[in-house]
Amino acid sequence: VAPSVPAVRSIGVLPALYRLLLGTQVNRTRLAALGGLGMAAILVGFAIGRSDPVDPLVTGAAFINSFGLSVTVPVTTLVFASAALGDLTDDNTLVYLWVRPVRRWVVVVAAFLAAVTVTVPLVVVPLVLAAFLTGGGRDLVTGTVLASGLGVITYAGLFTALGLRVRRALVWGLLYILIWEGFVARGGDNAARLAVRSVTATILASWSGADLRLAVLAPRTAYIAPFVVVGLALLYATRRLNRQDVA
């Protein structure tokens, strides 16, 4: 149980917390398994380029959207972001951070930044390389950078909060990705707008000109929405951490 009036420290402790949480997320099993998704994307991108498609831009965009933005980005980000604070909650060690005289938002931001740091090289880099190898050109590469990067940030905010909200956050996150984004969101534009995938698909479609599933947002909205979602998710996580009993 937390002290009734915890002391607080400044943002100066953020780097130390960031390094601590980064270390808890990185292990060989996760890196090998999720790095495999990136390698698969690179190999398929190379195969598409070698097949000499009629329209490399559209073909490449369809692949990046269906595999990269629909599987690689959300699943990889889920594994690391949900674990950032979720693992500590599940094994009852979050209390060791909770009783420290540190502002709760600093803990949440450190967890979010740690998740993004691990995920970006595992997701954005291989997807950009895959986009390049398809032969789709500069527009496809640029669209992939923006869509995958903003996708990682958005999912990281949501899944960091999810890790605090529920136990077994990985399972709940997979249900969201597979059921809501994979099926329900395809039932209509209103449902699609509640899926992060609509943001990434819209950004990629705006650069590639391809007709992509779930690309239902206005481009301006697709660029603004990630920052709104992340802000709200981290605010919720901070409030949750302030109120919950972790011991």
Regions found by a protein language model. Name each.
Residues 13-16, 189-212:
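Short hydrophobic, aromatic-rich alpha-helical segments embedded in or entering the lipid bilayer
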Residues 96-103:
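Short helix-to-coil transition segments within interhelical loops
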Residues 25, 65, 108-110, 238, ...:
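A generic "structured core" feature
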Residues 30, 103-104:
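Short coil/turn motifs that cap or connect alpha-helices
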Residues 35-87, 91, 108-176, 185, ...:
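Secretory targeting signals
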Residues 209-247:
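Alpha-helical transmembrane segments of multi-pass membrane transporters/translocases
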Residues 2-35:
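Aromatic- and glycine-rich beta-strand/loop motifs that create alpha-glucan
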